[in-house]
Every structure is written in structure tokens, then in C-alpha cells.
Amino acid sequence: LSVALPANAAIKVLATTSDWGSLVTELGGDKVNVYTATSPLQDVHRVDAKPSLVARARSADLIVATGAELESGWLPVLLQESGNSKIQPGAPGYFEITSALRLLDIPTAVDRSMGDVHALGNPHVQLDPRNIAAAAKALSTRLAQIDAPNAAYYQQRGADFQARWQQAMARW
């Protein structure tokens, strides 16, 4: 799964939301260069795959998406237009947060009368702090896989984050 990067190059990460952008920054420190596709005030369901965003995807080493079809209205177009084989589904540089989690609210049946329903389950996983811990663990592992020479760095930052996060959860 390792991607060849120059020795001092930071991993270029495109995160679909500011939540995941912040988490990648926390886990990757100075080894990552993070760009977030959306602002906290944007509806992540509806984003335009503008040329500037396509250019970011074209040069990315890793894309971090929520998954569970949250970004289905724009992410597939962005990935296709980027022409970047490193960040296509199934590639090491494509990571869906929900792949590390158990989704809730999975409907047993979906039809048009139900309106806009998340057929794969509730993708708004960042609302549960326990999901952040699980996402951080999986994401630090993925960073270590992509940038193997710095694997220990990502593992240490992941462990440090877990300790701080568990302390914060105990206070909540």
C-alpha cells in the first residue's frame, strides 16, 4: 500500500469536510498538507466539482471522505475528472471514514416516497465522539501505510490523539 514520496514531501490530502481535515492535520502534523473541499457552513451533500477542486484532487496522495454515499452527488465526478489513479476507490489513497465504523439507522427498505434517505445508514458519524476515536485509529494506520518511512510518526501521533481524546470524553 505504500506510495513513493520524496523523502521530505508532505502527503497531499484532500478531505471532503473540515472535520476530517482537522483530524488528518492532528494525526499527520507536519507530514501532511491538507486541503478541505468544504467549509463548516457548506452542505456536504451538495458541492460543485469546480476546476479548482479537480486540480486539488489531481495532485492529492490521499482523499479522506465520509463515505456511506454522503458525498455521492459530487465526489464520483471529482474523482473521475481528476484522472488521479492514486485516489480512486480501492486504491490506497482513497479512504472512507465509514469503512472503519458501524453505521446506525440503516433503513430496511428505501423508496422515493421517503425523500432524501441515506440508504447505507446515517453518514453523520462525527456526531458521536466514539466514532472519532475509531476513525482516528483507522486513519493513522492508513497514513502509516501510504507513507511507510514515517509510519512510527503517525502511530505515535495516533496514540497521543487517542489518549487526549479519551481524557476529553471522560470529562464530557
Map each language-model feature to its residues.
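Extracytoplasmic metal-acquisition and chelation regions
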Residues: L5, A9-W172
